[in-house]
Amino acid sequence: MLDGSPLARWLAAAFGLTLLLAALRPSAAYFGLTGSEPLTILPLTLEPEAAAQAHYKACDRLKLERKQRRMCRRDPGVAETLVEAVSMSALECQFQFRFERWNCTLEGRYRASLLKRGFKETAFLYAISSAGLTHALAKACSAGRMERCTCDEAPDLENREAWQWGGCGDNLKYSSKFVKEFLGRRSSKDLRARVDFHNNLVGVKVIKAGVETTCKCHGVSGSCTVRTCWRQLAPFHEVGKHLKHKYETALKVGSTTNEAAGEAGAISPPRGRASGAGGSDPLPRTPELVHLDDSPSFCLAGRFSPGTAGRRCHREKNCESICCGRGHNTQSRVVTRPCQCQVRWCCYVECRQCTQREEVYTCKG
């Protein structure tokens, strides 16, 4: 994908990108971008089959761990929602990192190597995956695509004289409970497992923090005698921006050897850490992303990324950073694009074709 493309271009790509989620070991439940199996292209909509069997086969195609497969089979709408969640997560990850050296490369061998280490990038993958699943499930409930959940009734919010609860809110209560059970928790003695689980929860908490109450007025002549209100999730792009900020301020915890950075040593617990037995728990109470290892530079091709040689960059914005001081090539090309578009009655858009010359910058090898 081209760096610097508008968000709309990334969202349009969703029609052709649907990724397979996977689970790993019996002791752990992993999801989407954090699975070790290859991300495989699947149809977003299920093929027409006998209604009673279609979602069973879809869940089997996802190659889930036993518990996850059982949860998938409970509701005919889960399989399609899981696939949608992975697609959302992948697209948002690539959009948020489009100007970075690591541009959320999800090719199998790079992703597999990355997930074996506790980098900041790994933390982001866990958080964006759990956030994507939480968001997609809550929306699927309110859209009527699930059998075991419907709209959010918000029983914890007080009805007031001036307004009443109504509409169809996104069911965050159901989705967050489902996600925590779906992802599971590994042994608390395993620091890496606890770090991964912590980052999963950060994704869920960011979704919760973005919930807003939306209201619609009812009354004579535009008055607001009665308001109908419901809870609505923030657009997933806003969630992605929030998680990207958390990635940039991620906290390093624990004690580990950094093969990627060539360093080793004990790390002091971060601010706001939880007090475990003997005060030894390094994980923070606050919803911050945490990591164990220093990230590699991602400048050169290696185990964790294909490097930045040949990457497109923006001369005034990020060429110096992305190209790692190697400089960049400049290529001039002529492009033709629709321009001066007008809507004609009825009902089509008429555009002229405008030709212009533009310069493309790519990193030197």
UniProtKB/Swiss-Prot annotation:
In the record, biological process GO terms are: canonical Wnt signaling pathway; cell fate commitment; cellular response to retinoic acid; cornea development in camera-type eye; embryonic skeletal joint development; iris morphogenesis; negative regulation of cell population proliferation; negative regulation of chondrocyte differentiation
PTM info? Palmitoleoylation is required for efficient binding to frizzled receptors. Depalmitoleoylation leads to Wnt signaling pathway inhibition.
Disulfides per UniProt: C93-C104, C141-C149, C151-C168, C215-C229, C217-C224, C299-C324, C313-C319, C323-C363, C339-C354, C341-C351, C346-C347
Family matches, as Pfam families: wnt (PF00110)
Signal peptide positions (record):
1-29
Lipid modification (O-palmitoleoyl serine), residues: S221
Per the annotation, which location comes first and is thus the protein's main one? secreted
- Which GO cellular component terms, listed alphabetically, does the Swiss-Prot or TrEMBL entry include? extracellular region; extracellular space
Residues annotated as region Disordered? 260-287
Annotated compartments: Secreted, Extracellular space, Extracellular matrix; Secreted
Q: Which GO terms label this protein's molecular function in UniProt?
A: cytokine activity; frizzled binding; receptor ligand activity
Glycosylation positions?
Answer: N103
Task: Write out the entry's keywords from A to Z.
Answer: Developmental protein, Disulfide bond, Extracellular matrix, Glycoprotein, Lipoprotein, Secreted, Signal, Wnt signaling pathway
Q: Its biological function?
A: Ligand for members of the frizzled family of seven transmembrane receptors. Functions in the canonical Wnt/beta-catenin signaling pathway. Required for normal timing of IHH expression during embryonic bone development, normal chondrocyte maturation and for normal bone mineralization during embryonic bone development. Plays a redundant role in maintaining joint integrity.
Q: How does it assemble?
A: Forms a soluble 1:1 complex with AFM; this prevents oligomerization and is required for prolonged biological activity. The complex with AFM may represent the physiological form in body fluids.
Q: Which PANTHER family does this one have?
A: PROTEIN WNT-9A, WNT RELATED
Membership in a protein family: Belongs to the Wnt family.
Instruction: Tell me the protein's name.
Output: Protein Wnt-9a
Organism annotation: Homo sapiens
